[in-house]
Amino acid sequence: MSALLSGIIIEVGSFAFIRLLGGILILPTYATFAQPLLAVAAVGTMFIGNLSALQQDDLKRLLAYSSIAQVGYILLGIATLTPAGFSASVFHIWNHALLKGTLFLLAGVVTFQIGTRSLKEMTGLGRKSPILAVLFTLSALAMTGVPPFGMFWSEFLIVLSSLTVGSPILTAAVVLMLVNLLISIAYYFRIIRTIAFGQPSDALNANSGGRVPKLLIIPCVILISLSLITGLYPNMFYQPAVNAVKGILTGFSR
């Protein structure tokens, strides 16, 4: 359920925002007022999400706050009030859904295996289950925006579309987005360090549930593979986002 809520339902609101208001907000009459407000809201959402995630020991709660920050990135693309920015945001929705869905599924697997959501109690999990450590590491790295995963391209396109507008407010928002990316790197690397390295904690030794069922791992492998394919062939997935936005804005212009 957590994977569904974070990977799909949260993003539906962002897409609905573009669908319902995008064509109206790009009108010059509204853009003058809407753009600064959206940019400030985007940056505020990023900081609230990332700074809250940075303080969490509960893995699922950390991922949930991280999702709030991702909505901020999506909102920054919307704040450009351009087709390129809208398309970048829709593309980011796809990439976030894949990766955050993977991480929530993995968090569920760990909870199923050892009965805890505490990162401290997951120390050394990789020594008990290398496959979980590998999947957590790949997913967390991908969420930080490193290539060759798809998140790199959608974040790059959000930055590019924001800078192309030439607005000082959006330029400042991009700088603050980069600061937020550094914050997210800090807590995602904490996940990697905790799970993939170190000696197994006492709680882990006491509660380890043995081998991880393949049926729990296969969906995670599929999702992270889709993220990798998106990064290697970005236009295959970006173009549908462009077409969707074009269809929305064309509908408003009629």
Regions found by a protein language model. Name each.
Residues 1-156, 160-187:
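Hydrophobic transmembrane alpha-helices and their helix-loop junctions in integral membrane proteins
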Residues 129-131, 181, 189-254:
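Cytoplasmic/organellar membrane-interface segments at the starts of transmembrane helices
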